[in-house]
């Protein structure tokens, strides 16, 4: 996310913070017990938006366009140490900007006539690099959360400090309006494993309060929020989810999995009154702040189906984008995409459709990544993780989308899942299809062996690594998930 769980290389919420160096619990229950501990596999907001009858396409239409304005004057930047990424001329000292574009790069004595007499900016030896590319993030969920209060471990080492921040937020919020926090992670923040309604009642009893766990598959709320949702001891657990309860069977404010969280979140009026396109534009601005100039969504359609394309178009039409945007459509929506006649490469330099995303397994920290060997201490049918798509179906999907000209991106975390992905691409290559033609990828590619690297090179496949998970989950991988040798 950029995954908002710090699983992505760009964390749109916090930039590049330092986190505590050790986990309080190597694999806390709220992660290890969750069969969908990766937001790109199961989007928690989709159910809440459906229940709240929120139409993202309608929100997109409310986005104002930027007024026409004069183009900035030409600018010659000098005195720089420019890393060009051009092997023929790897270093330069100046560049010329015209009409908002870099028109020339080189050494000052070679500057074109157009550079004469224009405004100058002397960088006094500072280093300039090309903009960074964020290859795997999920824009609509980030946009939904961009104005929630960050109470995560990058800001607060303890749950008490996080709750104090929520208290400040509540005092600055009109009575009756929602106070929403995000990024809470009890595996890294000292204090209780869960934020119960009693703890959140200490934040406020005049506001509904809701907090998203950093996994996005666990939520916590106060008594006011439970009352708004009509949740009491008689409320049954939604299918595939759980309402946390105390010893007497009364709801304790802990909501496990999307359907349970949606029962509460749907009542947040900001869902309907917000503008997700504005949120997307804000995320682009946050990306710019850490040097990112192009972002790619890897799972379009899993949030609110084809309506997400309306959001992207409104972002483009606003004339206010500050970074380029690319996206891969989700295999889960294959029938709808085929019905709409979508093709690879449609769009322009600002917004373009570039990939077809297939999720083949789960997440390693959630013990659902498909592995050659069983997870530590795991038994039963899912001891080796889970395949989210049958092998023959994966083979067929890869072949079909390669024939259509798509850049196919296969989500594969476990080594067995990577084996299956490589096999699918290899079978297609035997049939005359070239995975390298569109730079096909294996997303996450987490548990990778040497022979798999060689096979990827042979097939012309690129890995898109979950860099953040090494920092965030490394100790858990060693101690509780894989063991030292595999980790």
Range-by-range predicted roles:
Residues 282, 286, 420, 465-470:
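A glycine-rich, aromatic-flanked flexible loop/lid motif
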Residues 392-396, 419, 423, 440, ...:
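Feature representing long, continuous alpha-helical segments
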Residues 447-487:
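Active-site-adjacent C-terminal substructures of enzyme catalytic domains
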Residues 315-318, 342-351, 435, 456-460:
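Acidic (Asp/Glu)-rich catalytic clusters
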Residues 438-449:
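Aromatic- and carboxylate-enriched substrate-binding clefts and catalytic-loop regions
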Residues 423-434:
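Polar interaction faces of repeat-based domains
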């Amino acid at each position: 996310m950029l995954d908002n769980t710090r699983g992505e290389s760009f964390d749109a919420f916090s930039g590049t913070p330092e986190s505590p160096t050790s986990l309080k619990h190597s694999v806390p229950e709220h992660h290890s017990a969750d069969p969908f501990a990766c937001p790109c596999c199961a989007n928690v907001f989709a159910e809440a938006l459906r229940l709240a009858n929120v139409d993202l396409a309608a929100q997109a239409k409310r986005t104002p366009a930027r007024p026409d304005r004069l183009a900035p004057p030409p600018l010659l930047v000098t005195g720089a140490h420019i890393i060009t990424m051009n092997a023929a001329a790897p270093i330069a000292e100046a560049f010329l900007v015209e009409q908002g574009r870099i028109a020339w790069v080189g050494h000052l004595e070679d500057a074109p006539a157009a550079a004469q007499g224009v405004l100058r900016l002397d960088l006094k030896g500072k280093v300039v690099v090309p903009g960074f590319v964020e290859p795997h993030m999920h824009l609509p969920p980030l946009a939904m959360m961009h104005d929630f209060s960050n109470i995560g471990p990058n800001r607060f080492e303890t749950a008490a400090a996080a709750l104090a921040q929520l208290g400040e937020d509540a005092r600055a919020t009109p009575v009756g309006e929602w106070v929403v926090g995000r990024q809470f992670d009890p595996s890294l923040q000292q204090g209780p494993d869960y934020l119960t309604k009693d703890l959140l009642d200490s934040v406020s009893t005049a506001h509904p309060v809701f907090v998203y766990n950093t996994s996005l598959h666990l939520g916590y709320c106060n008594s006011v929020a439970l009352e708004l949702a009509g949740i009491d001891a008689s409320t049954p657990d939604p299918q595939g989810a759980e309402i946390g309860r105390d010893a007497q069977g009364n709801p304790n404010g802990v909501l496990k999995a999307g359907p349970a969280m949606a029962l509460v979140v749907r009542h947040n009026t900001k869902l309907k009154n917000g503008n997700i396109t504005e949120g997307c534009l804000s995320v682009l601005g946050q990306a710019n702040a850490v040097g990112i100039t192009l972002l790619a969504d890897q799972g379009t359609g899993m949030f609110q189906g084809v309506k997400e394309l309306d959001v992207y178009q409104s972002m483009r039409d606003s004339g206010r984008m500050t970074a380029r945007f690319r996206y891969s459509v989700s295999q889960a929506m294959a029938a709808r995409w085929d019905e709409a006649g979508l093709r690879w490469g449609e769009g322009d330099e600002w917004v373009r459709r570039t990939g077809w995303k297939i999720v083949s397994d789960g997440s390693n920290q959630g013990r659902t990544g498909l592995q050659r060997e069983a997870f530590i201490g795991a038994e039963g049918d899912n001891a080796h993780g889970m395949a989210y798509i049958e092998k023959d179906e994966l083979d067929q999907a890869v072949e079909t989308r390669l024939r259509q000209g798509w850049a196919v991106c296969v989500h594969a975390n476990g080594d067995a899942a990577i084996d299956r992905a490589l096999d699918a691409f290899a079978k297609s290559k035997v049939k005359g299809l070239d995975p390298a033609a569109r730079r096909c990828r294996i997303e996450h590619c987490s548990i990778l062996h040497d022979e798999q690297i060689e096979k990827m090179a042979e097939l012309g496949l690129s890995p898109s690594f979950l860099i953040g998970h090494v920092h965030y989950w490394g100790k858990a991988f060693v101690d509780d998930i894989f063991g030292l040798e595999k980790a």
